[in-house]
Amino acid sequence: MGGASMSPSEGAGGGVDLPGTDRAGGSANSQESRGVGVEKGAGRAGEASGTVRDSWLDEWSPDADGVPYRRAARVVVLDPEGRVLLVHGHDFDDVDHSWWFTVGGGLGEEGPREGAVRELREETGVSADPSRLVGPVLLRSDEFRFAARTVRQDEVFFILAVSGEEARSAKPGYDLTAAERETLDEFRWWRPAEIREAEAEGETFYPAGLAGLIETWWPEWDGIVRNVTDRALE
């Protein structure tokens, strides 16, 4: 699932075709779809490579038992065909410890909706008003190993239905931090059936049961707010 590399000017400027789309407005054959890779190297201005890990850990605060904890918001970006935009990333310490997940990230002082659309713009270049977000549709509690430590995260998931034009004009890796550039590898559109096929071949997707969840969210959310607990400590 390797992706074509994307130059810095493409990541911060005008058009990069995401897999499965074409400029004429149609959909490319899914079997020919390939992800769009993230340009490696420095992130935002002022973030030296030696401080990348520390800057990532600054987003977390000790929980009651001392485990690093943060709140996060995520956006399930769905195109008119019901495909979801996912990000492929890996651990700081182990490139083979990798998985696919939805757009989003840690929250600052802002609310979940505001944080979700901020993360959406930073990671994809797509700007959306918080009022366009549907949900929350999923509340996820997660405890996992990352950067050689156990961390804990509570996530709120929203749906954003994008137009074909928004999907085609997305700019993967638009404004990533240095930590994100180091650990994020690829953006790609996925159909639920493709997710199931990839899982059968050994790929990991979060949240657990993502393909089935998408089918409850598209073409219309069934109105149920689901709760998921994931533990990935190995």
Question: Where on the chain are the PLM-derived regions?
Answer:
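Conserved Nudix-box catalytic region and its N-terminal flanking loop in Nudix hydrolases
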Residues: R83-E123, S127
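Active-site-adjacent beta-strand/loop module that shapes the phosphate/pyrophosphate-binding cleft
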Residues: R140-G173, R188
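Short connector loops at helix/strand junctions that flank enzyme active sites
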Residues: R70, H97-T102, V151-E155, E182
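Nudix hydrolase/Nudix homology domain
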Residues: G2, S7, L18, D93, ...
